[in-house]
């Protein structure tokens, strides 16, 4: 019985989702351990920004092959199923935000964001299981998020002026993140046409809902970044 139990624990720990949540926890623990050992003051906000930045860059690493596939096969990537890397991309992005909900204090904006983009859009992406989700997450969370959250971390550590971060994020949003969300939506339109013509209305509804949220997210946070920069500039 003990051997069977140990085998079960071993198999569970080797499952992708456990591996990824463990990695997120380990990154966070190393940050806490370092500051505790060397008695360095820190804020949970700075801790979250750095964790978010690191995990976002992990998302970029695993998403890059799917991004290439989507661009090279834009007419049919919406129906290409998840591969091992796609699962990692989804798990890291999804679990990071669950981790945020459990271990950090959320703002009202965080709650809205997590409800729409994690609770709803995350579920839709899981039901679709298309590599198109990797393309979306590359732009939604991956590269622009990895850069900006590191800049926000530097701001919290008084290594960078807030106005500089806001200016750089406005540029990232306008010329990379928002266009990337539009590109993802445009590529996904091929699937809408296909599913409608072939009467696959369940898939059609899932895809329309997912693409709508991706498009909205890109443009909404583009607007928010500009508003924030303008307020800081005045």
What role is predicted for each listed range?
Residues 48-199, 228-230:
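Multipass alpha-helical transmembrane domains of eukaryotic endomembrane proteins
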Residues 1-107, 203-234:
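N-terminal signal-anchor/initial transmembrane insertion module
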């Amino acid at each position: 019985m003990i051997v069977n139990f140990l085998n079960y624990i071993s198999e569970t720990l080797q499952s992708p989702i456990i591996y990824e949540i463990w990695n997120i926890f380990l990154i966070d623990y190393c940050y806490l351990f370092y500051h505790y050992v060397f008695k360095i003051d820190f804020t949970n906000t700075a801790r979250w920004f750095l964790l978010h930045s690191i995990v976002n860059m992990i998302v970029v690493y695993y998403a890059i092959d799917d991004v290439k596939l989507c661009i090279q096969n834009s007419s049919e990537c919406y129906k290409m199923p998840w591969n091992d890397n796609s699962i990692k991309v989804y798990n890291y992005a999804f679990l990071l935000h669950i981790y945020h909900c459990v271990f950090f204090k959320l703002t009202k904006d965080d709650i809205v964001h997590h409800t729409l983009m994690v609770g709803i859009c995350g579920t839709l992406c899981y039901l679709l299981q298309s590599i198109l989700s990797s393309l979306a997450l590359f732009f939604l969370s991956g590269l622009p998020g990895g850069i900006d959250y590191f800049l926000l971390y530097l701001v919290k550590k008084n290594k960078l002026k807030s106005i500089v971060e806001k200016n750089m994020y406005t540029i990232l949003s306008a010329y990379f993140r928002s266009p990337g969300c539009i590109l993802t939506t445009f590529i996904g339109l091929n699937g809408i046409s296909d599913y409608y013509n072939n009467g696959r209305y369940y898939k059609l509804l899932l895809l329309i809902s997912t693409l709508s949220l991706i498009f909205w997210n890109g443009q909404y946070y583009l607007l928010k970044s500009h508003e924030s920069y303008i307020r800081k500039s005045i």
